[in-house]
């Protein structure tokens, strides 16, 4: 930015200079700083036009003098300010500025020049679906704001109104954008079934984890992503585990996809055979990119001592089975699910000073998976070992102390169960319910 310090005496050497008009100016938008003190107006503008390469024709403006101090100004803006303050007429034609005395006694600026005070209009927009405060934040933040420097937007939460004050063109652009953004958001219903199931029963449901020969619809992750036998796992999952092995009783992420059309019936049948224990069947309803969660469990109290004032307080830690889902709908109606599954349970008692505290055994899965509308994602990897002891004996004879072993048989059954979460997302249109959607899908099949 250039600086010009012009005094009245400086122009004594410029009075004999003729008026210079350049046919091909370089630019008239270069910004500069200027300070004038009782300077002759015509000679000052003539010298500035010469230094700025601006085409300027000055009419009979008498012997006006001017004092001013302006920062970060360009030549067109300077001419507008002078025309307004000295009641002159400013026009621009074919790249040439014309500055003349005003016959009406008021400063006039031609329509093809920006005025000092822009014309602002006010407009209110009633929102039907979007929240006024959130939409206003989207319109005013960031480098892509549609507001002009003189514009403003306010909102009224009670009536869910946006009040826009800006130049007419900016108001029209903002109204078009609001119309695109104020639309009903698609809802996503998340069906989850949290069960413990044997490995044999899981295979009966059609789940194949693909431990050594992963297929298109089955993936298994144990530890880091780099040590697995398939190459495109990073395109399907976003997982970070600290361990690199999966011993018995540990947690390893397993993801698969199955046809969930008859899943409820099959799980109920397996439950009657005591091969499945259905822990919970939560249903979550949320909107695009909004989190939904459900927890089931208990809170364990802990005594916390404050050494400063020698007081004690009670704090609680959660030991729950929890599911948190954040869906993202793509343009082709595929759904990216951010899943956080936690299985936290009270652990062993640990001596702490003169008291005992209960530890919390934590197992968590945090991953991203893609699913189609209505497709069932299966998450597993939390294992539980159960040992069942039983005794078969002949009545009466099996109770005689000396000979009872001849007429009885003891057996021990070792069973490995896995905590499995079935997650099925459904995209609901406006006014649609999950029950109506499922009936519609079953009718098509």
From Swiss-Prot:
Locations listed in the record: Cell outer membrane
Signal sequence extent: 1-23
Record key words, sorted: Cell outer membrane, Competence, Membrane, Signal, Transport
One GO-annotated biological process of the protein: protein secretion
Keyword Transferase: no
GO CC annotation: cell outer membrane
Coiled-coil segments on the chain, per record: none
Main location: membrane
Family stated for the protein in its record: Belongs to the bacterial secretin family. PilQ subfamily.
Function: Involved in transformation (genetic competence for DNA uptake).
NCBIfam families reported for this sequence: IV_pilus_PilQ
Name listed for the protein in its UniProt record: Competence protein E
Source organism per UniProt: Haemophilus influenzae (strain ATCC 51907 / DSM 11121 / KW20 / Rd)
Lineage: Bacteria, Pseudomonadati, Pseudomonadota, Gammaproteobacteria, Pasteurellales
Protein encoded by which gene: comE
